[in-house]
Structures are given as C-alpha cells and as structure tokens.
C-alpha cells in the first residue's frame, strides 16, 4: 500500500494552468462542510489516500486545483448535498430573505432567482413567514464566502448563545452588590453635595 500523499497548495480556479493540464487532474467531489476545512483526509479517484493541510481561512470552491507533494493535481468539485432552495420571481422578497440570512451570518448561495442554504428547521420557518417556499433538494452548495471572512462563520444558534451569554454577563456585572467607601464617587439618594443649614 502506497504512502498517503500530502496536499498543501491551492491554485484558485486553476488560474494560469493550461486546459489540458486541468483535464488530467484527479477529480475530488466535496460537500461544503469539508471544503470549509483546512485539515482533512480523503480517498482520491485513483484509490490513493490524501491528507490535506491547506492554508487556514480558505473555502474551496468548484474548479479549484490542489497540488500534492508528489506533483499530482486534484480538481475540486462541489458535491451534491442536502440543501434548501428558496426560489422566487419576486426579487424584493428574495432580498428580504437574503438580508435576514446575512444578519444571522448564515452561509448563503446567491443565484439568479434563488437563494440556497443548508437545511435548518428554524430558518425554514422564518423563510415561510416571509411568504417564500423552502424546497429541500440535492444540489451543489457554493455560498458566498466574503460575508463571513473566508471560512469563519457562526450558526445562528451559536451567535444567539454568545450574544445571550454576553448580555447575562453585563447584567450580572451591573447588578453586582457595590460596597461604598470613602473613595466611592457614586452619588446616592439622600446624599447631597451642598451643605445643610441647621
């Protein structure tokens, strides 16, 4: 059994490579969950095992070329996966949906007349409340990457949890009992800055 190959280099969309070179590359179909990682292992189409150590912060997209330490080239393809497609002829409604999804830092694919997200029952309820249909299907998922920093993203649940925890902390700090001493600069009910006349 041959040793696993190591893959570290990305050539975005195969820029600068001849079409004949790209045509000879091994194809590797990956779902978004894996394309969003920098460290993973996969079995290539020729049966070899490959360990990927890619630059952090990158999201692989359909057409990227990866170069292994032995010179092998691997063409990335977006694999079909479970997605929710939001299709409409009403551009304004789609814009509203895109706004709400973006506000929650949800990876979203933008297409002509449709949006596409990963399945999420909470988001699907929101989509339907906006008057749009959420259709489950198998399709490649290629969300916009710029909106969440090239791979760094939070689910809406994580965002809510972190925001809620921060709010709780701020509230706790505000409500913490305060011992007043000579150096305290707070003014309190019943305290006066002016002298009393007796």
UniProtKB/Swiss-Prot annotation:
It is found in: Cytoplasm. GO terms for molecular function: nickel cation binding; unfolded protein binding. It holds the Pfam family UreE_N. One of its GO terms (biological process) is protein-containing complex assembly. GO terms for cellular component: cytoplasm. Residues 176-198 are annotated as: Disordered. Keywords: Chaperone, Cytoplasm, Nickel. SUPFAM superfamilies: Urease metallochaperone UreE, C-terminal domain, Urease metallochaperone UreE, N-terminal domain. Its main location: cytoplasm. Belongs to the UreE family. Involved in urease metallocenter assembly. Binds nickel. Probably functions as a nickel donor during metallocenter assembly. HAMAP family: UreE. This is Urease accessory protein UreE. It comes from Polynucleobacter asymbioticus (strain DSM 18221 / CIP 109841 / QLW-P1DMWA-1). The lineage of its organism: Bacteria, Pseudomonadati, Pseudomonadota, Betaproteobacteria, Burkholderiales. The gene is ureE.
